Design a protein with these regions (language model features):
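HotDog/MaoC-like acyl-thioester-processing domains
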Residues: 1-14, 64, 81-174
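Short, functional N-terminal and low-complexity linear motifs
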Residues: 69-71, 147-151, 183-190
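Solvent-exposed, non-transmembrane amphipathic alpha-helical segments
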Residues: 28, 45-49, 124-126, 154, ...
């Protein structure tokens, strides 16, 4: 299957209305491993509505997620697609409930060469009802074995340098074996998270 660069870049995803509340905040927090210590006030505030509930900041990742690239015209084999890096910029804190408009866009597709991946770079703004941008989510998707389509090869982002100082804070969260199954409840229905046979592809 050959990746169709022109078709992907010409695609204009529709805006996605988002409505969420306390339940979604709690499910997201449980899906990233919070609540493993059910008596820790630092975790309870994300998983219990009577503990001063807060939305975990990275919840912006799943709000208004545009889904996978399943249109056959894109020439992308969905079985070979995995999530890459994600950057979240919060312009203001996420409320524990609200209505937003997700505005996704495809920024670029980078060619890593024949036999390698194509990196699909996306961005989306989460826009409040008053028109202000609440968060911007930049992400990369790796389409394994889709390189060699003749696209750009030099625009790979440079990773941030590792700080040479001691960390300001350390967070150690265990990840239970069923965490991917819980995370799917946020709307990411990629079979990779639940189907062992699919994960072997």
């Amino acid at each position: 299957m050959a990746l169709n660069y022109e078709r992907i870049m010409a695609h204009r995803p529709a805006d996605i209305p988002v409505s969420y509340g306390e339940r979604e905040c709690i499910i997201y927090a449980l899906g990233i491993g919070l609540g493993m210590n059910p008596v820790d006030p630092g975790e309870l505030k994300f998983v219990y509505e009577r503990a001063g509930l807060q939305a975990f900041p990275t919840m912006a990742v799943v709000l208004g997620w545009p889904g996978r690239m399943t249109d056959p015209a894109f020439g992308v084999d969905d079985r070979l697609v995995v999530a890459g890096d994600i950057k979240v910029v919060l312009h203001r804190p996420l409320a524990v409930e609200g209505k937003l408009l997700s505005r996704p866009r495809i920024k670029e597709v980078i060619d890593k060469g024949p036999g390698n991946a194509a990196i699909i770079q996306n961005t989306r703004d989460l826009i409040a009802e008053d028109g202000t941008v609440v968060a911007t989510v930049d992400s990369s998707t790796f389409a394994r074995k889709h390189g060699g389509f003749g696209g750009k090869v030099t625009d790979t982002p440079v990773p941030a340098a590792v700080p040479q100082t001691a960390p300001g804070q350390i967070c150690d969260l265990p990840t239970p074996p069923n965490l991917a199954l819980l995370y799917r409840l946020n709307g990411d229905e990629n079979p990779l998270h639940a189907d062992p046979a699919r994960a072997k592809v």
